[in-house]
Amino acid sequence: MFKELALIGTTASGKSDLAFELAKEFEGVILSLDSLALYKEIDIASAKPKSWQLEAVRHFGVDEIYPDEEFSVGAFFEIYKNAKEIARLRGCPLIITGGSGFYLKAMLSGLAPDVPKCELNLSNEEIYELALQNDPEFAGKFSQNDSYRLEKWYQIYKFSGQIPSIWLRENTKPSVIKELAIFEILWDKDELRARIAKRTKNMLDEGLIDEAKFLFEKYKSEPKPLKSIGLKECKQFLEGEISKNELETLIATHTAQLAKRQRTFNRSQFEKKFVGDLAQTRSEILKFLKG
């Protein structure tokens, strides 16, 4: 039976392994939300599913493009539609999983068009006052300490010459998912740090440095994916800036910082969801799929 669900969690939370296990059990399809697994040749740094896993379960959102090719959220929408069509035809679950909550949020809420950045010649307080006068709908939702949203508001205001709240409603691409069961794996902070440290060591043992060396030699322009955690630190190591021990420590530290940002994003953006440890989350998903 076709059902779709999202399995989210921070990096190193075990969501990919659980998604694979469930997809095997229910003959399902997986859509990866991982913004790095999209790229061919970035295998270890992205903690991409192994080749035998990709053969055993149909994956979408993995090995879609090369690191120097352009990609957009709109393109991801199309990948989602293809994955959903295959799952519907097979009459099986579609399991959406990965660390890029931004993609999931866009699919649920719609996609605002890109707006060129402009020079910010006002303080947060001044932008907020401007929003309060011209766009109280927006100002009522955010504080004057929310730099990111205030800057986005000001960019739209300058670019469109219209009230941003109205402009966004008129120009946002509609959502592609109306309702979705969302399950989040949550770990104790210390346990997650230990998992991150272990995964970092495993990635280095599997050949992360060699992968990075290959990528930096092939892509001299250093496209954005090569600036990701794991690869940027390897570049420092390859250039003699840090030692092997410092490399492992830096990757683990930066990954833990990423996990904190992911947790904050998931908490603030996805209110209606089940949250539990790995075993609890697995149990709840099984109930959902069998129900």
Swiss-Prot record:
Top-level lineage group: Bacteria
Keywords for this protein: ATP-binding, Magnesium, Nucleotide-binding, Transferase, tRNA processing
Swiss-Prot/TrEMBL GO biological process terms: tRNA modification
One annotated GO molecular function: tRNA dimethylallyltransferase activity
Residues the entry annotates as binding ATP: 9-16
Record EC number: 2.5.1.75
Interaction with substrate tRNA: annotated segments: 34-37
Cystine connections: none
Pfam families to which the protein is assigned, alphabetical: IPPT (PF01715)
Root EC class: transferase
Record site: Interaction with substrate tRNA: 100
Binding site for substrate: 11-16
InterPro entries assigned to the protein according to its UniProt record, in alphabetical order: Dimethylallyltransferase, IPT, P-loop_NTPase
Subunit organization: Monomer.
Family: Belongs to the IPP transferase family.
Function of the protein: Catalyzes the transfer of a dimethylallyl group onto the adenine at position 37 in tRNAs that read codons beginning with uridine, leading to the formation of N6-(dimethylallyl)adenosine (i(6)A).
Protein name: tRNA dimethylallyltransferase
Protein source organism: Campylobacter concisus (strain 13826)
Species classification: Bacteria, Pseudomonadati, Campylobacterota, Epsilonproteobacteria, Campylobacterales
